[in-house]
Amino acid sequence: TLIGYNTLTIRKESQKYQELQQKYQNQPLDETTHSNANTPTIYCIGDSLTIGAKSSSYPTALSSATNFSVNKFGGAQDQTQDIAIRMGKIKIYTNNITIPETATPVNLKIYDKDNNVLNVLKGKGSNFTTVEIAGISGKLKYNATKKTHTFTRDQNGVEKVITKLTQIKSEIPTFEKNNVAIIFTGTYDPQTQNGIFKTITYQRAIINQLKTKNYIVVSLTSKRRLPIVDDMNKVLKEEHKEHFLDFRYYLLNDGIKDAKITLTAQDKKDLQKGYIPSSFLQVDMLNGNAKFNQLLAEQITKKMIDLKYIDKNDIK
């Protein structure tokens, strides 16, 4: 299973989520928490739009709707490159540091195998907090004020001088081939010219590491953050073909009807600008609320059936 966010956590969240859903869905709670032994585990891989907050996340809604085992993996502020690192596809290194005898933080830079400095792992996530460097276990942290990473060894020991590229290791997830991956990344990727192609490069790395053909890539959603989001999604669709789920298009069209919401004046202004209606979003106008997450879970379920990853009879 993927580390960091286990199935038990999702099960507990799922119950809270069902209670939350009752506020706008007059349906009885389904107390079932057992997953069918023959159904796949679903791995939801991404940033804050996947990790969610408290009891509201689309993986929680997905678990509630299908009764499948669901695992979350990633980090709230992760770029696609960060997730490729967390998955173990991209190895990271450090160099030219001295790890002291005591548990004193030491500044370090992170490099790739070609000695290029990487601007990565600035937020917390499923792994790469507890790490090992040159056989010494410790904690990797990012100081946003000083814009530097630090390594603090767990226990006092012998000083270690590092003068060559040395891998920073962490616990890496394993993935079973018959399971399903939902990849929802790119929202926090750098907004540079042709940046979407870097997103695709790292999404390819993630898919390659998963070693499965059973995956779905969710579209980018936020035009507020990504002004050319529709053009970016066209590129993603061309790359991922039938695996691509255009959730943004759905939200701007059928999602309003399916959610059974009455558009507010603000929602109508949002739609005129090509923005996701505020009624689907949290106060940050980026992350989805419970309605958003429920609709995404439903669209992913439909997509998994269309792609024959699951059978509709598998759903509770």
Regions of interest found by a model, annotated:
Residues T1-N6:
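Hydrophobic membrane-insertion alpha-helices, especially the h-region
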Residues T39-S56, A76-T80:
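Catalytic nucleophile-elbow at a beta strand-turn-alpha helix junction centered on a G-D-S/GDSL motif
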Residues I10-T39:
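N-terminal, intrinsically disordered, polar/charged segments of Gram-positive cell-envelope systems
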Residues K16, D82-M87:
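Ligand-binding grooves and catalytic loops that recognize ribose/phosphate and carbohydrate rings
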Residues K12, E19, P59-A65, G88-A103, ...:
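Alpha-helical cap/lid subdomain in secreted, periplasmic
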Residues I42, V70, Y215-I216:
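Hydrophobic/aromatic residues located in beta-strands of well-ordered beta-sheets
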